[in-house]
A protein has these predicted regions:
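Conserved alpha/beta core of the MobA/IspD/sugar-nucleotide pyrophosphorylase nucleotidyltransferase superfamily
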Residues: 1, 142-194
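Nucleotide and nucleotide-moiety/phosphate-recognizing core
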Residues: 1-130, 138, 161-170
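Short glycine- and hydrophobic/aromatic-rich loop-to-beta-strand nucleating segment
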Residues: 132-136, 175-177
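Short, small-residue alpha-helix embedded
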Residues: 135-136, 140-143
Length: 194
């Protein structure tokens, strides 16, 4: 399982990983929910705000992997995670820490859905696209070298036949925190502390 927490939050101007919901940082919340699914291995990719984010996770289990190229975008963190999961041969759940409505039940539903999907993959529906959180195959993770910049696996998941990918419809996961407007909306909706 991969929790991506390396971003620099440049559009927000403050580390979104450390925003809180109910007094708990979003990164702690994401890792706690990920751990609740009892993964074989849990890695957290750190980059921007590395020490602050690691400190927020001090009481949780998981391997912290540092992405020295975090400024290059999401793909560089996926490359680090792929290297860190060498030897793991099962499905891989990939999630960020910027969806304040995320619950462990979302993650478990994705894992269960991927288990029954022909492709072995499951993804969250974001409008007409597929995205995070998502379950991908180990082979897809190993092929992350073809990703660049802020590319994730959404395009590859969308290119699979639609009936082979299990889809999670969870409107509450549409809200992810990228900028001040998202933060304001999340506070107004009760998803973040004010």
């Amino acid at each position: 399982m991969i929790v991506l927490a390396a971003g620099g939050s440049t559009r927000l101007g403050a580390p979104k990983q450390l925003l809180t919901r109910g007094g708990e940082t979003l990164v702690h919340r994401a890792v706690r929910h990920a751990a609740a699914t009892h993964p074989q291995r849990l890695v957290v990719v750190l980059g921007g705000y590395r020490s602050e984010v690691a400190c927020a996770l001090a009481d949780l289990n998981g391997d912290h992997l540092y992405n020295p190229r975090w400024r290059e975008g999401l793909a560089s963190s996926l490359h680090v995670a792929a290297q860190g999961l060498t030897g793991h041969d099962g499905p891989v759940l990939v999630l960020g820490c910027d969806q304040p409505a995320l619950e462990a039940t979302h993650l478990q539903r994705l894992l269960d859905g991927a288990n029954s999907a022909a492709s072995g993959c499951a993804a969250t529906v974001h409008g007409t696209a597929l995205g995070s959180p998502a379950v991908i195959t180990r082979a897809m993770l190993q092929d992350s070298g073809g990703l660049h910049g802020d590319q994730g696996f959404g395009g590859r998941l969308s290119s699979l036949s639609s009936d082979s990918v299990w889809r999670l419809d969870a409107a509450e996961l549409q809200l992810d925190i990228d900028d001040a407007a998202d933060q304001i909306a999340a506070i107004a909706g009760g998803w973040l502390d004010g």
